[in-house]
Amino acid sequence: MTPPTSNSSMVDSLSSWVAESLSSDMRNNYSTSVGKGRAKLACGFYQERWCIDALQKVVSINEILCGMSFIHSEPDSDSSTTSADSNTLSQHVDKTSVPLDTSIVVKRLPEVEQRQWHKTIKPLPATKITIRLVPIGSTRAITPKVLQVSSDQTVAVLMRFIAKKLRISTDSVYMYIHNTFQPTPDERLGDLYDQFRTNQELIFNYCNTVAFG
């Protein structure tokens, strides 16, 4: 570096630039040092060397500050990785199929419950079933005793048929399956046939008075 013709002008210009780049405390120390340096103007090389050292310190401070700014400006790679993992997990959950255990449980249901379960999904087509009518006690027997009816008919239809044959009101007809229990009028004959048939026949016992219970 070629020393300038006037050490005093170089010191003044460098002093003002360096002082603006420093904090207040550093600026006071710097001004004190410059004041001491002015007392040594006879040694121009010393003054020039001191100013160069001061400038190098300022440059070093700026480099440190720039490095800190760069660190804070870097993207958070961990957060982006976590977000990507969350998206992958949600996609995996959405594609999960029904567990195999569920189908195993359905297959192991009792036979009657399996048929009922299949009917709720797709009702079975109506078929012809055999009904045998057996009178109880002194109730008059009707003919025919064996009927072929549709499986989607209800017990109420059969009660009206018996009432017509006996020439009594429907309220006076009491019907039982195998002399055991009395079905409700809205029950389907096909369902009762599937559960209580004997020798491919559903046996109904009937009378015009209460027989049981």
Swiss-Prot record:
- Tell where it localizes: Preautophagosomal structure membrane
Q: Where is this cross-link: Glycyl lysine isopeptide (Gly-Lys) (interchain with K-125 in ATG5)?
A: 213
The UniProt entry, under Gene3D superfamilies, shows: Phosphatidylinositol 3-kinase Catalytic Subunit, Chain A, domain 1 (3.10.20.90)
Report the SUPFAM superfamilies cross-referenced here: Ubiquitin-like
Biological process (GO), any one: autophagosome maturation
GO CC, sorted alphabetically, is:
Atg12-Atg5-Atg16 complex; autophagosome membrane; phagophore assembly site membrane
Name the InterPro entries for this protein. Atg12, Ubiquitin-like_domsf
- Could you cite one Gene Ontology molecular function of this protein? Atg8-family ligase activity
Q: Which UniProt keywords apply?
A: Autophagy, Isopeptide bond, Membrane, Protein transport, Transport, Ubl conjugation pathway
Domain of life the protein comes from: Eukaryota
Annotated membrane topology is: Peripheral membrane protein
Could you tell me which Pfam families the record lists for this protein? APG12
Main location class: membrane
Q: Which family does it belong to?
A: Belongs to the ATG12 family.
Q: How does it assemble?
A: Forms a conjugate with ATG5.
What the protein does? Answer: Ubiquitin-like protein involved in cytoplasm to vacuole transport (Cvt), autophagy vesicles formation, mitophagy, and nucleophagy. Conjugation with ATG5 through a ubiquitin-like conjugating system involving also ATG7 as an E1-like activating enzyme and ATG10 as an E2-like conjugating enzyme, is essential for its function. The ATG12-ATG5 conjugate functions as an E3-like enzyme which is required for lipidation of ATG8 and ATG8 association to the vesicle membranes.
Instruction: Name it.
Output: Ubiquitin-like protein ATG12
Whose protein is this, by species?
A: Meyerozyma guilliermondii (strain ATCC 6260 / CBS 566 / DSM 6381 / JCM 1539 / NBRC 10279 / NRRL Y-324)
Q: What gene codes for this chain?
A: ATG12
